[in-house]
């Protein structure tokens, strides 16, 4: 079965793997997934990620991050836009996630950025997901 929403699949795999306390999870490679993972790493939600190839297909191995009590750093990660329902926002109407404790990831004309960066640059875009 073909995956039509690679971002949604990635978010689900990250959520499920962190809930059962896996050390890592393998995801299908896509530029959007790579951009989102760069933000998650920069914001401290994952340890790291690297690329590996199995039978000619490139995967991304994500090393998940836990606190000192072995609780996942990612408490909740949810897709906002889907292939059938794209949600856009201007920088003025950008929603806050968990009263500023979470992050919003958006796809803008300047690439995939956080909601805070979008407000600072005064650009809007498609709301991809929220993380806290």
UniProtKB/Swiss-Prot annotation:
Organism domain of life: Bacteria
High-level lineage: Bacteria, Pseudomonadati, Spirochaetota, Spirochaetia, Spirochaetales
Classification via Gene3D superfamilies: 3.30.1370.30, 3.30.1490.10
Pfam families: Ribosomal_S8
PROSITE patterns reported for this sequence: RIBOSOMAL_S8
Keywords, sorted A to Z: Ribonucleoprotein, Ribosomal protein, RNA-binding, rRNA-binding
Protein name as annotated: Small ribosomal subunit protein uS8
Function noted in UniProt: One of the primary rRNA binding proteins, it binds directly to 16S rRNA central domain where it helps coordinate assembly of the platform of the 30S subunit.
One function term, GO molecular function aspect: rRNA binding
Coiled-coil region: none
Quaternary structure and interacting proteins, as annotated: Part of the 30S ribosomal subunit. Contacts proteins S5 and S12.
GO annotation, biological process: translation
GO cellular component, one term: ribosome
Keyword Metal-binding recorded: no
Protein family according to the UniProt entry: Belongs to the universal ribosomal protein uS8 family.
């Amino acid at each position: 079965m073909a995956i039509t929403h690679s971002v949604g699949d990635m978010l689900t795999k990250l959520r499920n793997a962190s809930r059962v306390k896996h050390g890592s999870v393998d995801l299908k490679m896509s530029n959007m997934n790579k951009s989102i993972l760069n933000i998650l790493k920069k914001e401290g939600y994952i340890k790291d990620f690297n690329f590996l190839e199995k039978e000619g297909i490139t995967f991304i191995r994500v090393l998940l991050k836990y606190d000192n009590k072995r609780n996942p750093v990612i408490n909740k990660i949810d897709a906002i836009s889907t292939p059938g329902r794209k949600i856009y926002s201007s920088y003025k109407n950008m929603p806050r996630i968990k009263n500023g404790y979470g992050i919003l990831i958006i796809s803008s004309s300047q690439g995939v950025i956080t909601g805070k960066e979008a407000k600072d640059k005064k650009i809007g875009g498609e709301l991809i997901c929220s993380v806290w």
